[in-house]
Structure formats: structure tokens, C-alpha cells
């Protein structure tokens, strides 16, 4: 488990892909092996059933099975967060309760999507989720490019009177989001980068870690980059950032998680194609990823 008081879920939290078998069903044994591999290669926290885990295409029974599988595999070593967000408050409340009952160490709760509630509605939504499982630490997740609305810093600051609101995934695509949150919330909120390529500048603005996709492939290097920065070795951190950036950007050349699943396949992890409506990576994406991963190998 993480002992980093300022980073309650660890510094590198991998937003884990969901492996599928050839028939499209969950491959739970592979999910367990992948979780163990990630923890052994730089991840000090895991998130299951997030965007990268294709939660919109998973039934709730599948999500519960996946959460339990990953908890059984690595839950005694690192924090395991469950994605429990929904644009229905009642569904988010129930999902969060069930994740807590399974023993999850935290929940990632996304801003309600599509129905675009006002700030008052967002505040009421998150308060209801927090009250449903008061013992379960929550990470709020702001990603306006996917949800159609944004959680404002002032609203976030008001939510800090819920004792279990402890962290925030910043995925608006700007480092200024971190600065605005720091001004509104001070050090009471652990801010995580939700964009691999912005992790280093977000650390400089006050973030404590990253919820990462790239860590599937370069977790050791990403962890080292953060360690260098936190220890004041900024030149070393910058060098690693620049080395990783092409891969970080390449993993978002089309809709996530299509590229990272293809990259894992290229590394020998048969995680399967994404479920529809997402599509498998085409040959040009696979060729690009192969080149980018080759560039990271030691010479």
C-alpha cells in the first residue's frame, strides 16, 4: 500500500485496460496477470473500470468481477481504485457502495456526462456519492472534453468538507487547471495529472502524481521521472519527459484505449480489441506504436 501521505493512491496510478478473450468476454486470469506485471514495473496504484478500461461497454456484473479480480491479485500491495461514476446519481451511489463492499481502496468518480448539469447539480451529485460510502476515499475526475461540462475549482473546494473527497484527476488539457485548484483548495486536495504528456508541468504546478496510460508500457521510466522531479533533480526529470513524450502522444493518436491495447498486443499481451463502438488499431497505428516503443528500448 502507498505510504505517500501527499499522494494517497501512489504517484503512478495505471488506468488499466480491460482484457477480452477472443469471444469478447472478460479475460479475468489475464487481468490478474497484467495487474501483477504493472505493479512489478512501476505502478504503485491501479484504476480499473475507468475510461481506459472501457467502462461504458462493461456490464455492472463484469465491472464487479474485474474489481474483485484485481483486488485479489494486487490489493495487498497497492491501492486499487474502481471507476464508479455515472451521469445518473443513483447509479453512481450504488456503484460506489458496491465497490466499497468489495474492498476497493478508493473510487474514481467522473463528472456526470451528457446531461451537462450546473455547478449546483454537480456539487449535489458528488455529495450524494461521498455520503453513500463515507469510509471510501474518492478521486473526483474532471474531463470536460468527454463529459461536456467542467467541475469548477470553487465547487471542488466546497466539496472538501466531505472527509472522503481526497483527490482529483485533472484532465482538462491545461496545466492552469492545477494552479486554479491549488488556489481554491490549497494542499487539502491531492491533484493527479490525467494527461501523461502534461505530468511534468503539472507536477511543477503542484500535482502529486499521474493517472496514466503510458505506464502500461513505460511504468519504470515514468516513475523515475516523477521521483527525479520530487527529489529536485529537474534536469533528469526533463530528460525522461522528453524521451517519453513521443510515446505519450502516440498512445492518443486515435481513441483511447485502442492504441494502448495494440501496443500491449505488440508486447505479447493478448488483451484483445476494444469493444464496439471503438475499433481495433489499423496497420498504420500499429506501425507507429512499434516504432515508438523500439525507440525506448536501451541501445
From Swiss-Prot:
InterPro entries: Aldolase_TIM, DapA, DapA-like, Schiff_base-form_aldolases_CS. It catalyses: L-aspartate 4-semialdehyde + pyruvate = (2S,4S)-4-hydroxy-2,3,4,5-tetrahydrodipicolinate + H2O + H(+). One of its GO terms (molecular function) is 4-hydroxy-tetrahydrodipicolinate synthase activity. Its EC number is 4.3.3.7. Keywords: Amino-acid biosynthesis, Cytoplasm, Diaminopimelate biosynthesis, Lyase, Lysine biosynthesis, Schiff base. It is an enzyme of class 4 (lyase). It is found in: Cytoplasm. It holds the Pfam family DHDPS. The keyword Cytoplasm applies. Pyruvate binds at residues 52, 211. Pathway: Amino-acid biosynthesis; L-lysine biosynthesis via DAP pathway; (S)-tetrahydrodipicolinate from L-aspartate: step 3/4. The active site is at residues 141, 169. GO terms for cellular component: cytosol. One of its GO terms (biological process) is lysine biosynthetic process via diaminopimelate. The record marks 51, 114 as: Part of a proton relay during catalysis. Catalyzes the condensation of (S)-aspartate-beta-semialdehyde [(S)-ASA] and pyruvate to 4-hydroxy-tetrahydrodipicolinate (HTPA). Homotetramer; dimer of dimers. Belongs to the DapA family. This is 4-hydroxy-tetrahydrodipicolinate synthase.
